[in-house]
């Protein structure tokens, strides 16, 4: 497995680590998303402990309005985080 493929598998595994806790096994509830963000992205997303921030992120990600974040919706968050990280690397 290449380094990139290994990282992709890691993203899937982390998503599943949090998605299986409550409700549907392949989606994130707001509580599961908060736990994932505050644990895995604590140094990347500001104000992760602020409930209003989590509420806004969840609302923005939940494109279909089903009160769950599926893997495709979760990837929107990762894409945004990666774009910001990429821009910050070029600023340094």
From Swiss-Prot:
Entry binding sites for Ca(2+) 1: 19, 24, 27, 32
Chain sites annotated for binding Zn(2+): 16, 26, 86, 90
Family annotation (PANTHER family): PROTEIN S100-A12, S100 CALCIUM-BINDING PROTEIN
Region annotated Hinge domain, chain positions: 38-53
Localization annotation: Secreted; Cytoplasm; Cytoplasm, Cytoskeleton; Cell membrane
Membrane disposition: Peripheral membrane protein
Subunit details: Homodimer. Homooligomer (tetramer or hexamer) in the presence of calcium, zinc and copper ions. Interacts with AGER and both calcium and zinc are essential for the interaction. Interacts with CACYBP in a calcium-dependent manner.
Domain annotation EF-hand: ranges: 16-48, 49-84
Biological processes, Gene Ontology terms: antimicrobial humoral immune response mediated by antimicrobial peptide; endothelial cell migration; inflammatory response; innate immune response; positive regulation of canonical NF-kappaB signal transduction
Keyword Membrane: yes
Protein name, entry field: Protein S100-A12
UniProt entry tagged with the keyword Secreted: yes
Binding site for Ca(2+) 2: 62, 64, 66, 68, 73
Role played: S100A12 is a calcium-, zinc- and copper-binding protein which plays a prominent role in the regulation of inflammatory processes and immune response. Its pro-inflammatory activity involves recruitment of leukocytes, promotion of cytokine and chemokine production, and regulation of leukocyte adhesion and migration. Acts as an alarmin or a danger associated molecular pattern (DAMP) molecule and stimulates innate immune cells via binding to receptor for advanced glycation endproducts (AGER).
PROSITE patterns: EF_HAND_1, EF_HAND_2, S100_CABP
Residues engaged in binding Cu cation: 16, 26, 86, 90
């Amino acid at each position: 497995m290449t380094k990139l493929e290994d990282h992709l598998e890691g993203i899937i595994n982390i998503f599943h680590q949090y998605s299986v806790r409550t409700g549907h096994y392949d989606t994130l509830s707001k509580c599961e998303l908060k736990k994932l963000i505050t644990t895995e992205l604590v140094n990347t997303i500001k104000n992760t402990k602020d409930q209003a921030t989590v509420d806004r992120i969840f609302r923005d990600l939940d494109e279909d309005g089903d009160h769950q974040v599926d893997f495709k919706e979760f990837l929107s968050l990762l894409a945004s985080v990666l774009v910001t990280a990429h821009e910050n690397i070029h600023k340094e």
